[in-house]
Amino acid sequence: MTLNSLPIFLVLISGIFCQYDYGPADDYGYDPFGPSTAVCAPECNCPLSYPTAMYCDNLKLKTIPIVPSGIKYLYLRNNMIESIEENTFDNVTDLQWLILDHNHLENSKIKGRVFSKLKNLKKLHINYNNLTEAVGPLPKTLDDLQLSHNKITKVNPGALEGLVNLTVIHLQNNQLKADSISGAFKGLNSLLYLDLSFNQLTKLPTGLPHSLLMLYFDNNQISNIPDEYFQGFKTLQYLRLSHNKLTDSGIPGNVFNITSLVELDLSFNQLKSIPTVSENLENFYLQVNKINKFPLSSFCKVVGPLTYSKITHLRLDGNNLTRADLPQEMYNCLRVAAEISLE
């Protein structure tokens, strides 16, 4: 990974654990309940130390208040907002962040091109609402789209078209099936993070961009993986497929032998054997399967001074293995392992 890509990578990593933690005190170091600027909606707060942010959280609002020009960061979390009129943001062309989590928004009540007119918008978060499909059209400046915890059943082809700067998409906890999103992410060549966990996928969608670093399919109903599905993913580092219905017969021999992969989670499936992985893999989670054998060939093709597995954490607890099942030469292959959990 280049130094230029490191900052965005660190942001993505932090987002795994703090997806919705963008509180004002943490972000900007001020008290959000202090004095407000004169140019602010009366029911909201625009802190003196950060006057381009307007906080309207937890106010039981049913409509979006008038937003003064000059506001760049707008927070409307935990309200009762049901609709957005097309002219709502006409006065705030500089808006960069629009956070609408925990409201009552529906697609039919988001009017016209209300979002696409925001030519500087970078973050759009509409988590925990009542959406049934992805919102759109959206501005090409967008880099972070979060639509998790809705009732989304489809992402229409073209809904995300032209979003060349989009790096993060959260679609977890919806009602998506593979056919309803196949091809929806085509052309998103900057996409690094895609979360499709907790949906209704029975197979993997087609047409995902090969730029991805992090790809999450956990908590679905996936039973098999097409041969060479991940072949084009040259930079994929984190892959989660836990809590699915994967069996040995549904996993082609080398499908997880991805040289860029750092972490692979296959826990809580129905595997009886350990799939072959790259020697570059560092974290491998296989707990709560039906594994009953430990072939070193799954980790090391050849063992030598410079050829060994880089795995540091290996979880095998909740399987049909004991310490006695581990081959004596295991540590020649797994020589840098700091943790091997069996029970």
UniProtKB/Swiss-Prot annotation:
Residues 1-18 form the signal peptide. The keyword Secreted applies. Residues 31-69 form the LRRNT domain. GO terms for molecular function: collagen binding. The modification Sulfotyrosine is found at Y20, Y22. It holds the Pfam family LRR_1. Contains keratan sulfate. Gene3D superfamilies: Ribonuclease Inhibitor. LRR repeats lie at residues 70-91, 94-117, 120-140, 141-162, 165-186, 190-211, 212-232, 235-255, 260-281, 282-301, 310-330. GO terms for cellular component: extracellular space; fibrillar collagen trimer. Disulfide bonds join C300-C333. One of its GO terms (biological process) is positive regulation of transforming growth factor beta1 production. InterPro entries: Leu-rich_rpt (IPR001611), Leu-rich_rpt_typical-subtyp (IPR003591), LRR_dom_sf (IPR032675), LRRNT (IPR000372), SLRP (IPR050333). It is found in: Secreted, Extracellular space, Extracellular matrix. Glycans are attached at N91, N130, N165, N257, N320. Keywords: Disulfide bond, Extracellular matrix, Glycoprotein, Leucine-rich repeat, Proteoglycan, Pyrrolidone carboxylic acid, Repeat, Secreted, Signal, Sulfation. PROSITE patterns: LRR (PS51450). The modification Pyrrolidone carboxylic acid is found at Q19. SMART domains: LRR_BAC, LRR_SD22, LRR_TYP, LRRNT. Its main location: secreted. SUPFAM superfamilies: L domain-like (SSF52058). PANTHER family: AGAP008170-PA (PTHR45712), LUMICAN (PTHR45712:SF6). Belongs to the small leucine-rich proteoglycan (SLRP) family. SLRP class II subfamily. Binds to laminin. This is Lumican. It comes from Coturnix japonica (Japanese quail). The gene is LUM.
